[in-house]
Amino acid sequence: MALSMKPFRADDSGFQSNNLWVGSLTPETTESDLTELFGRYGDIDRITVYSSRGFAFIYYRHVEEAVAAKEALQGANLNGSQIKIEYARPAKPCKSLWVGGIGPNVSKDDLEEEFSKFGKIEDFRFLRERKTAFIDYYEMDDALQAKSMNGKPMGGSFLRVDFLRSQAPKKEQWAGSYDNRNGNMNHKPQYPHSYEDFKGDVQPSKVLWIGFPPTATQCNDEQILHNAMILFGEIERVKSYPSRNFALVEFRSAEEARQCKEGLQGRLFNNPRIKIMYSNDELPPEQDDTSFYSGMKRSRTDMFNNDPSFVSSPHSTGIPGSMRPLRGTNERSYNGAEYNDVVGKEPNWRRPSANGTGILPSPTGPGILPSPAQGTRRPMRSNPDSWEGYDPAQLVRESKRTRRDGSVDGFTPMGVDERSFGRGSVAARPIRGPPDSDHIWRGMIAKGGTPVCCARCVPMGKGIETKLPEVVNCSARTDLNMLAKHYAVAIGCEIVFFVPDREEDFASYTEFLRYLSSKDRAGVAKLDDGTTLFLVPPSDFLTDVLQVTRQERLYGVVLKLPPPAVPVTASYRQESQSNPLHYMDQARDSPANASHSLYPPRENYIRGAPEHLTAASKPSVSEPLRIPNNAAPQAGVSLTPELLATLASILPATSQPAAPESHQPMSGPSTVVSTAHQSNGLYNGEAPSQAWKRGPQTVHDASNQSFQQYGNQYTPAGQLPPPPSRYPPASNNPNYTSGMVHGNMQYQSQSVNMPQLSPLPNMPHNNYSMYTQGSSNHPVSQPMVQQYQPEASMPNQNYGPIPSYQQANFHGVTTNQAQNLNPSQFQAAMQPPADKANLEPQNQALRLQPMISGDGQGTTDGEVDKNQRYQSTLQFAANLLLQIQQKQQQQSSGTPAGQGP
């Protein structure tokens, strides 16, 4: 037994009280048994029995009577058990008072006025025939002061005021309040006096006991409760006790109460936790209460605050027959097929008409759900695979927002940040409008592919530009705190809100709303164009971040994020793929993470770009390769076909020695693309057009090693075919270094259409692991070319994870003849022949210099850096050709020293 229930012992402290604690009671002991036994010693004000705990409290009017009963009945046998009697410990101070000994001349108003002097009263219940009242204060200090009324005379009698017993006695106070204080106790079992006391049912009566959880705030309002039950018959009185989580409803007859109980059991306000059972006690009369709803003076729940005016439903204007018209329009209606055994089937409630001549169907009204067939019920919507076992049955069912028929007009964008709607403020929309004139979408909201409810989308301000699909599927969730961080970097956002499209969708809509709120999450839905829509429940994110008035709605938010900075080489890699642009993000993201991306596909960022930027994604051999950029196209250096042909012609066809020279180091990285050429401009003797069409060729070296080459060929028009969609695989032969790039690789910059010059075969030696462009047959020694090593960060900046063959340093150039050289022969200097007919003067190679200086100026720092890297690439090629020509001129009169076979 609880500590607060332990009695005082008279022999310990000499304490005496008119309140007796009686213990060792059997579970079968009833209030009538105690009344019969203890009523012999005096008038009893109240008896409170706790059968499950084996004790009771008995309140005598006078202390002397309590003392006499204790001495006479100590150890008496009651229902086979010897009872123990002690003086009860005083009740702990609380906000609830019990007032007894009220004289017959004291009215309810007089008593309430007297006790209201001590503070604001939350609930006042006066039971005249029992000469008892129960008073609940908002503050405990007020109740402590009102306790001083104990023993004060009023109306010819002395008041007895005491605190109600903590929790348990407070729950069962109605058991005593309905007892006959003069000892003429009834023998009927009492109904449960709190929501937790629900254990069973009793015989049918015209009074219904409604037990509800604290979250069911609709039951606190007697007007709403009346409107929900009036369809079943004439209601004499309604009394709600919010602090005790139950209400009493008295019908005109027991038959009407039975119909109401059967029709609303588990379906009242769409809350299965609300329990309805009979009460054999009549609702206490309130002769001094002139209002029909005594509880209407209390403040209603604020669940309807800030809501616009509601259009009443077809059944809110009146009820046929003897039923009185509904008194308000803030009612709820649940009549959807979700709660029928067959979709579309109308409810089957029927009740006798007022004149008894026929049967009238009970129309669907506010707060009433159709009664499904016995044993049948649609399963709750759930998809554990996508939403971590989302079980609506585990959610705490709270109050439901009022739903109205007609269009969703009157919802003005109150307090929304102006940047959410672009430029300027948005004027408030009219409060009234034609039906369905303000919604921009009607469709289905789904969770993980499972339909949740039909809904309408209403814009706030300008709404969203993206067209919503027929089904908005929430495939993932995201934390609201993370969403707030993304909002901080967004350049704007678009806001809408969703409301149930039909009455039967309201339950599942609210359930989904409560689920997101309880998890502090927002649903993530991918739209058809790749835009991400966030479904945000009522939360602090709305009020603190979006500056939107918080209401019980599901909001849709689309963030406008700045486009990420895409490097040139990254854009080029995307353009080199055969898939369209809008598949890039899908291929990059895994299926589980695709719906979480906040950035739409990159095609959204180039909607206004020229047509050639998007057309470049299609592989073509007849158009030059173009590198897209987010900015406007810049005027860059363009090498004409004639100049490129000249550049190819000045490169000798045989291997010649070259001494180490000092060159300007390459200041930036270059983009590596895949090509292959033949030194004479043909592919194995074929015409260029035929060479374009050839597939991959397998070239074998002396060590019988092979690798893939692509038969791309230089054309007079100076055009390049699109590069392959992937890099050639590196060979596993130990003679190849991990950093080798095959002969089908060349340098390519952002805005130059560079043609292929000559083929570069494979090199089966680990001292030379990277080939540069050009068809020169003059090998350059390793120390000279090592000065042109690219920056170590170049591969990571351009391509992310880089294959091993792409991470090596640039070591030198070689020729077709280098295939058969051993390491010692290959490192030997090769001198070009003196009779090379197609050598050009040195100034031909210098022609590249003025063209390099003509590179266009970038509009941003990133583009300037790209242009500088591009210039460095061309500078490297020009310097390399210049050094080769210088060596040719210096050694033209000498004899070659160590020419290869």
Swiss-Prot record:
Region: Disordered, residue numbers: 343-416, 655-736
SUPFAM superfamilies named among the record's database cross-references: RNA-binding domain, RBD (SSF54928)
Deleted gene: phenotype: Late flowering.
GO cellular component: chromatin; nucleus
Biased composition (Polar residues): 664-682, 700-716
UniProt-listed GO biological process terms: cell differentiation; embryo sac development; flower development; positive regulation of flower development; regulatory ncRNA-mediated heterochromatin formation; vegetative to reproductive phase transition of meristem
Domain RRM: 18-90, 95-166, 206-281
Matches recorded under SMART domains: RRM
Subcellular location: Nucleus
Alphabetic keyword roster: Developmental protein, Differentiation, Flowering, Nucleus, Repeat, RNA-binding, Transcription, Transcription regulation
Domain SPOC: 441-537
Chief location of this protein within or outside the cell: nucleus
Presence of keyword RNA-binding: yes
GO molecular function terms attached to this record: RNA binding
UniProt keyword RNA-binding present: yes
Induction and repression of expression: Negative feedback mediated by FPA itself.
UniProt tissue specificity: Expressed in roots, leaves, stems and flowers. Highest expression in flower stems and meristematic regions.
Pfam families the UniProt entry points to: RRM_1, SPOC
Family to which the UniProt record says this protein belongs: Belongs to the RRM Spen family.
Note: While FCA requires both FY and FLD, FPA requires FLD but not FY to repress FLC.
Chain's role: Plays a role in the regulation of flowering time in the autonomous flowering pathway by decreasing FLOWERING LOCUS C mRNA levels. Required for RNA-mediated chromatin silencing of a range of loci in the genome. Cotranscriptionally recognizes aberrant RNA and marks it for silencing. Controls alternative cleavage and polyadenylation on pre-mRNAs and antisense RNAs. Acts redundantly with FCA to prevent the expression of distally polyadenylated antisense RNAs at the FLC locus.
Name under which the protein is recorded: Flowering time control protein FPA
